[in-house]
From Swiss-Prot:
InterPro entries: CobS. The chain crosses the membrane at residues 43-63, 64-84, 117-137, 143-163, 197-217, 237-257. This is Adenosylcobinamide-GDP ribazoletransferase. It comes from Shewanella amazonensis (strain ATCC BAA-1098 / SB2B). Pathway: Cofactor biosynthesis; adenosylcobalamin biosynthesis; adenosylcobalamin from cob(II)yrinate a,c-diamide: step 7/7. The keyword Transferase applies. It catalyses: alpha-ribazole + adenosylcob(III)inamide-GDP = adenosylcob(III)alamin + GMP + H(+); alpha-ribazole 5'-phosphate + adenosylcob(III)inamide-GDP = adenosylcob(III)alamin 5'-phosphate + GMP + H(+).
């Protein structure tokens, strides 16, 4: 198999794992396959962000910007099946609803959403809507670019947690899909550098440095937070990290726009 074909299959594997976009080829959905595909998690976010940006751009000609923002948010949920939002809700329920590590993991496996999960999801969506609506006051491109950056960078930095932290869900009863559980240096470098290049192309050197440093700090705090609760990460906690880091991107972009 050629290198190009092998890398294309890894990208498609990452795409089908994180989205509901169908692909016309048979792929290796094992944990090892996802380990190798992890380098493309950020670029999958780029595609999701581009589609959301296109939805916003087209609909803002017809509807108020706030409505276009909601439609773009709906588009991302439809594309991903609410994959990361589900992780945020499960993590909030688990971390908020128990004190013991095993009980937290047990709650996170439950498909039902509790009060902590409902609150976390509602507040995250409200904040996302408000931040994107505020960006829309500056320009259409600020929202479109923000969506691309938010989905790219949040997935890249959340996935980078796999590199130096421990996967803690080994039980056969987990409701989660197979998950990437390890990442080599070359994979994490490609993951972060590809996201950084996209950020550089869209924002420039100064803004890129501010965004990346902020995300690195936020990523470190989130990794410590989940390690303190359960001793490592699960698919749910990575989903929660993605949602939180996406909000961090929008917050930083809004601050940068307000200072320009």
């Amino acid at each position: 198999m050629s290198t190009f074909k092998r890398e294309l299959e890894l990208f498609l594997l990452a795409l089908t794992f994180f989205t509901r976009i169908p692909v016309p080829v048979k792929l290796d959905y094992s944990g090892e396959g996802l380990n190798r595909a992890s380098r493309y998690f950020g670029l999958v976010g780029t595609l999701v962000g581009l589609i959301a940006a296109l939805v916003f751009y087209l609909t803002q000609f017809i509807f108020p910007a706030s409505v276009a923002v909601v439609l773009a948010m709906i588009a991302t949920v439809l594309l991903t099946g609410g994959f990361h939002e589900d992780g945020l809700a499960d993590t909030a329920d688990g971390f908020g609803g128990a004190f013991e590590r095993e009980r937290k993991l047990e709650i996170m496996k439950d498909s039902r959403v509790g009060s902590y999960g409902s609150l976390a999801l509602m507040l995250a969506l409200l904040l996302k809507f408000q931040l994107l609506s505020e960006l829309a006051l500056y320009s259409v491109s600020s929202v479109a670019g923000g969506l691309v950056l938010g989905h790219t960078l949040s997935r890249a930095f959340a996935a980078s947690i796999i590199f130096n932290h421990t996967y803690v869900r080994e039980d056969a009863e987990s409701k989660a899909k197979p998950l990437a559980q390890s990442m080599h240096w070359d994979e994490v470098l490609f993951l972060v550098l590809s996201a950084g290049v996209i950020c550089l192309l869209l924002t420039g050197v100064g803004a890129t440095l501010v965004i990346l440093v902020t995300l690195f700090v936020a990523r470190s705090l989130l990794a410590r937070w989940q390690s303190r609760h359960i001793g490592g990460y699960t698919g749910d906690t990575l989903g929660a990290c993605q949602q939180i880091l996406e909000l961090v991107v929008y917050l930083v972009l809004l601050l940068l726009w307000s200072q320009s």
